[in-house]
Every structure is written in structure tokens, then in C-alpha cells.
Design a protein with these regions (language model features):
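N-terminal nucleotide/polyanion-binding subdomain common to many enzyme families
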Residues: 2-106
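Amphipathic alpha-helical interaction surfaces in cytosolic regulatory modules
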Residues: 301-376
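Short beta-strand/loop segment at the start of cytosolic alpha/beta domains
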Residues: 268-297
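Short glycine-rich anion-binding loops that position phosphate/pyrophosphate groups of nucleotides
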Residues: 58-62, 185-190, 212, 330-332
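A transmembrane-helix-recognition feature enriched in membrane-embedded lipid enzymes
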Residues: 87-92, 222-271
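Internal alpha/beta domain cores that form substrate/cofactor-binding pockets in large enzymes
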Residues: 125, 135-176, 183-215, 219-220, ...
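Short acidic/histidine-rich motifs immediately flanking catalytic phosphotransfer sites
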Residues: 84, 176-179, 293, 320-323
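Portal/gating segments that form or line small-molecule/metal binding sites
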Residues: 75-140, 144
Length: 376
């Protein structure tokens, strides 16, 4: 068993983070959630005294995260991250991850609105979009009563993130006290705006779902279900909006180049995963605690799928408020779930302005981290 680490009183948000079933994909923490599970989770989160940031990532988000550390950090700092698009789901399955379906933001909002059986309707504020799309989307939502009702909309026009973060804009949103704040400012600008203002916003769920406003407003027709099921929604979007073709082509080529460069690492990962599958999971940990630092040495085979006590250990790390030094001298294999926990730990160490160090990481383990996109 893992050696107990005396934790500090856990912050509720940190404790909640380490209860996630999260996996590292291209260096991003992706939650293993179904559409129904996500709907239920959001309905529970609106009851909490603090807000929740939801990110639904597609190929474009992944590609942008390669080159933009701030954008990557914004995704990592989200409280829920789901896969929006079949290509990412297929790639997750190639790594042996347990995800079974995508959770696209537009589908999620549509499903929440079409749920007319719920006793508790959720209020939604629409922020951004082109021209009058947000106002039109609000009208369409209220014209067809369901699980959502619109309490306001605002198009801030063109401007910087700072200009869109004025007291007047934040007050306009907050006075409606929405359960859901749907943001559509472009992926990078939208996530930056959320990162900057989440502490000032009184919305319970905050999410950048760019195209969703256009779908709700009826300005763009969503792909038929069969097209979405076979992973061809991107082709439908191009037919609807030809201006998207350059972006889709560029994103596809960049992702393909990354996949080709990591093909051999993927083969080695599958080999190591098979080779160590029947080896007992050694979760023994040796630790040394100082006044300002905690040092931990992990065992040989780190698999969350075979030992569910890891999240409790990582929670203790995150709530220690100390510098954390992790030694991987004996470690031969780390699964995507452990890498996901490492992402969360790094996030909270940075938020708490504490350091995290990784020592004695040998070549095989470095190759696994490179494949999964985990940056030390």
C-alpha cells in the first residue's frame, strides 16, 4: 500500500479535481465522461458555491495548444475537459484509454435544452458570437421552452481581452446570475477571457463553445447525426462555411506530422504496456519530508487502473503547500491516468506558487512522457 502522507486541510476545489477520471492526451487532461455523465455532472456543479470551467477540445484546440503555452495552461486549468470530435476519440483508444464517446459542446447544450422532463431549468447567458447571433440564439431558446432558458446576451464587438473585461461587461453578465455562461470569442481569446475573469463572474458553469451560438441561432446548420457518428462533421462544416477549409487543412497536417513523429514511441508504449500488464503494480513509495519540501520515490509500475489509491496520494501532495520532488528511478511504466494526475498536480503546484521537480527519469519513461505530451 502507498505510504500515508499527512495532508493539510484540503481545499474543496483541489479535492474535487483529484476525484476526476482524467487521462493525459497530447499533454492535456481529458475526462473520461459520457454525454449523460457530463449532463449530470453539470447539474450537480450548478449547486456549488463556486464556478466550474468546462472545455470541450477538438483538433484545432489541440494544435493551438502545441504552440501557445498560455492557451494550453487555460485548458489544463479547466475543471472539466471533454473530447469534441471523433479523431481525438480514436487517438485516445489507440492509447488504450477507456473513453467511449465524444462530448461536443453543441450537443451538450442541445441535450440540456431538449430535456423537458427536468424540474430544474438552467439559465444561460450568451456572450460573443458574430453580429446578432447571441441575441438570436437567446430568442430561439426561449421560443422553444425546454431545459434551458436564456436570461441575456451580449456581443462585445471587436476589442482586446482587457477591453472585454470592463466592469460594465462583467456587471451586465453578473446581474442575470446565469447557471451557464456560454462564451464565443474565438478559442484563444475566449479562453484568455475566461482565465482572466472567472474569479469575477457569478455564473456557475463557464464554457467557450464558439460554434454553438451559430447553431442555436440557426445561422449554421449542424451536421446530421449519421455524419457526426462516422466522424465526418468537419467535412459538413466546410460545406457550410468554406472559410474554415484553410484552418481544417492546416490543423490536420500539423496533427499528422505530430502523429508520424511519435509513431515509434506509440509502438514502444504498446509493447511496454503489454510487457508490464501482468507485473504486480508496485505502489510502494518512500518519502522524506522537510519543512519546505516533500520528496517521493515511486515504484516500478504505475497504473491507476490497478490501484485506485493514487488520487488520494496526489491530493496529499497538492495540499501540502510545499515543494514536491518526485523520483522515478525505479519506474518503468506510467499509464495515461497517472500522467493525468501529474498534470493536475503540476497545475495546483503552480497555482499555489510551489515548485515541482522530476528526478531520475530514464529514457524509456521520457519516451512515454513525450508520447503522451506530458511536459516536465
Amino acid at each position: 500500500m502507498i505510504q500515508e502522507v499527512p495532508p493539510s486541510p484540503p481545499d474543496a476545489r483541489i479535492e474535487q479535481d483529484f476525484q476526476r477520471d482524467v487521462w493525459c492526451l497530447f499533454g492535456l487532461p481529458v475526462d473520461n465522461l459520457t454525454l449523460e455523465g457530463t449532463k449530470h455532472l453539470l447539474r450537480e456543479r450548478v449547486k456549488l458555491p463556486y464556478n466550474t470551467v468546462l472545455s470541450t477540445i477538438n483538433v484545432n484546440w489541440v494544435v493551438q495548444s502545441f504552440a501557445d503555452p498560455a492557451f494550453r495552461a487555460a485548458i489544463i486549468n479547466s475543471d472539466i475537459v471533454t473530447l469534441d470530435g471523433k479523431p481525438l476519440l480514436w487517438l485516445a483508444k489507440l492509447l488504450g484509454y477507456p473513453m467511449t464517446e465524444t462530448v461536443a459542446g453543441s450537443t451538450l447544450i442541445q441535450e440540456l435544452h431538449q430535456d423537458k422532463t427536468t424540474d430544474t431549468k438552467l439559465s444561460i447567458f450568451l456572450f460573443g458570437g458574430e453580429d446578432d447571433a447571441a441575441a438570436q440564439a437567446a430568442k430561439e431558446i426561449n421560443k422553444n421552452p425546454g431545459g434551458l432558458y436564456a436570461v441575456g446576451s451580449l456581443n462585445p464587438g471587436f476589442g482586446t481581452v482587457e477591453e472585454m473585461s470592463s466592469d460594465v461587461i462583467i456587471k451586465t453578465i453578473n446581474q442575470t446570475r446565469p447557471d451557464i455562461l456560454l462564451v464565443a470569442l474565438g478559442a484563444k481569446k475566449g479562453t484568455q477571457w475566461i482565465e482572466r475573469n472567472r474569479g469575477r463572474l457569478e455564473a456557475k458553469i463557464i464554457s467557450h463553445l464558439g460554434a454553438t451560438i451559430n447553431f442555436l441561432a440557426g445561422k449554421v446548420q449542424r451536421a446530421p447525426l449519421i455524419v457526426r457518428r462516422i466522424g465526418m462533421e468537419w467535412a459538413w462544416r466546410i460545406l457550410q462555411e468554406p472559410k474554415l477549409f484553410p484552418r481544417y487543412a492546416t490543423d490536420g497536417l500539423i496533427l499528422l506530422r505530430v502523429l508520424v513523429s511519435r509513431f515509434l514511441l506509440w509502438r514502444k508504449y504498446l509493447y511496454l504496456m503489454t510487457k508490464t500488464r501482468n507485473i504486480p503494480v508496485d505502489t510502494s513509495v518512500s518519502s522524506c519530508e522537510g519543512e519546505q519540501e516533500l520528496r517521493f520515490s515511486f515504484g516500478k509500475n504505475l497504473r491507476l487502473t490497478k490501484d485506485s489509491s493514487f488520487p488520494k496520494l496526489f491530493l496529499a501532495f497538492a495540499t501540502s503547500r510545499k515543494t514536491i520532488t518526485l523520483s522515478f528511478k525505479q519506474t518503468e511504466f506510467v499509464d495515461g491516468a497517472i500522467a493525468g494526475l501529474l498534470l493536475l498536480l503540476k497545475k495546483h503546484q503552480l497555482k499555489n506558487k510551489n515548485s515541482i521537480n522530476y528526478t531520475q527519469v530514464h529514457d524509456k519513461l521520457n519516451q512515454i512522457f513525450t508520447l503522451l505530451g506530458f511536459s516536465k
